[in-house]
Amino acid sequence: MDLILVDTRLEGREKQLGGKDTTGKTAVDTAVWKSSGRTLLGLEQQQWLLEQLQQSKATWKILANQVMMMQVEAQALGLATNLDAWDGYPAEREKIYTFLQSKGIKNLVVLTGDIHCSWAANLTFNPFDSTKYSRLTGEGSLAVEFVTPSISSANIDELLNVKGR
């Protein structure tokens, strides 16, 4: 097993997008949001990560980072897109996914915290496109991600006063 740790909070990171429109809703310039130049890792760390993934001979590659990599269909949940996570840097995430696919890198597990609840998902270019990814079989998945809840801060169910399922 190879353990790869990256910093998605301070080193090389471009400030997350945000701001409000005249109605108080989060306003995002879509062209800036989807820009191929926006980076969460910074170019040096991004290159280092890709090298680590490609050079690894381990069966399992574990990537630990601070923010959720999976895509979230936030609007369907009545939430804003989390621009402070990989959803705020979609072009860079896609570059990593393209690299995984083109190099045939298998058995990548992403471990994440920060979101104050537990999540698990297959990582794929578009988890909502059933022609390229099967939620039933996982076909089309490039990696998996496990997100842990908070230890000492309030978790999302407590913050939103939502009962678990």
Where are these regions (language model features)?
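Long, structured stretches of catalytic cores involved in phosphate-ester chemistry, encompassing
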Residues: 1-165
